[in-house]
């Protein structure tokens, strides 16, 4: 079952919590309620079925071992739908294989018990990532970017080079250059550098001018 409190979701960050330990899930819900709107689930299936109040998760907090899979199952399920969600695994013990795989996937790792300080530090570290993601989504809608063009924009903002992007998408660099050209035509920018600089100004503005 999904335990969701959405009395006033507008304007609040949305957090996905997945933990089959009901008591600890309640603790996480209380800790996260200070910062935004937590949705608590207890298995992979319910986690992937849960819908964030505003259409996208700000972050996910995942127990590693779950009744129908594990934290990687949730993370990869979200990615398969095109949802890039900053994620932290919260576990009672560290396993080398889990830590290494989490690192490869860009996931953070925390060991129980955790408190408000750990939550605050994690949310501060992903603030920039969340701002970038929001600007990319805004531009996708505003300029009618395709999935490939959106990937080019996101890669530029994240500092991913074109060779790596082409390899990760399984396309040639010639095809990638075509996506870049079409993206620039839609954006009205003379170069990728100009587009990235303009997008970064929006990212900074969304973070309060830092």
How would you label these PLM feature ranges?
Residues 135-175, 201-202, 207-209:
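Helix-turn-helix DNA-binding segment
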Residues 1-134, 208:
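N-terminal regulatory/sensing modules of transcriptional regulators
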Residues 123-126, 156, 199:
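Hydrophobic "lid"/C-terminal helical patch
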Residues 181-210:
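Basic, Lys/Arg-enriched C-terminal extension of HTH/homeodomain DNA-binding domains
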Residues 122, 179-182:
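Residues within the DNA-recognition helix of helix-turn-helix
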Residues 25, 79, 145-149, 186, ...:
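Short, cationic motifs built from Arg/Lys/His that form the positively charged side of catalytic pockets
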